[in-house]
């Protein structure tokens, strides 16, 4: 029993990435950055192409990252339960959960940049 409680405690580390993504999304939403030169806010090469790119990025990135974090949090919870019931070692479970978290984070940046580029081409009505 004590081993299982320790395993559950270790698996809580899989929630770090989703919680940080939600936190950063909330901070970006509450404190939008209008100055591109400040190097704050959603700051990628695509968002720095022009002031219009920057403004749109600051508008959409918070909502995308909050939504991504919520989905990732739910996914990590289900994954942890499945891996715990399957008796997968904690090391493997942390590796799998961390890998999924990092992949989702990279995907969030990629998706946001695609939305910015589509909007600037006039293909995105949102």
What residue ranges belong to the model's regions?
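Long, highly hydrophobic alpha-helical transmembrane signal-anchor segments
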Residues: 1-17, 75-84, 88, 93-99
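A loop-to-helix transmembrane entry motif
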Residues: 10-13, 34, 38-40, 65-67
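Helical transmembrane-bundle signal
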Residues: 14-25, 69-72, 76-80, 101-112
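Membrane-water interface of transmembrane alpha-helices
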Residues: 23-41, 111-115
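Membrane-targeting and insertion segments and their boundary/processing signals
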Residues: 25-31, 48, 52, 83-90
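A short, exposed loop/beta-hairpin motif centered on an aromatic-Gly-Thr core
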Residues: 42-46
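Membrane interfacial helix-start motif at the N-side
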Residues: 47-66
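Alpha-helical transmembrane segments and their immediate juxtamembrane interface regions
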Residues: 88-126
């Amino acid at each position: 029993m004590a081993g299982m409680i320790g395993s559950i405690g270790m698996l809580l580390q899989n929630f770090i990435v989703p919680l940080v993504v939600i936190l950063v999304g909330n901070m970006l939403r509450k404190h939008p950055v209008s100055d591109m030169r400040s190097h704050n806010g959603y700051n990628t090469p695509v968002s720095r192409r022009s002031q219009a790119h920057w403004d749109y990025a600051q508008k959409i990135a918070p909502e995308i990252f909050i939504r991504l974090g919520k989905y990732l949090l739910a996914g990590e919870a289900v994954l942890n339960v499945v891996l715990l019931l399957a008796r997968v070692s904690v090391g493997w479970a942390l590796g799998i959960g961390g890998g999924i978290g990092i992949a989702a984070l990279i995907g969030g940046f990629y998706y946001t940049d695609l939305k910015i580029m589509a909007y600037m081409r006039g293909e995105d009505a949102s």
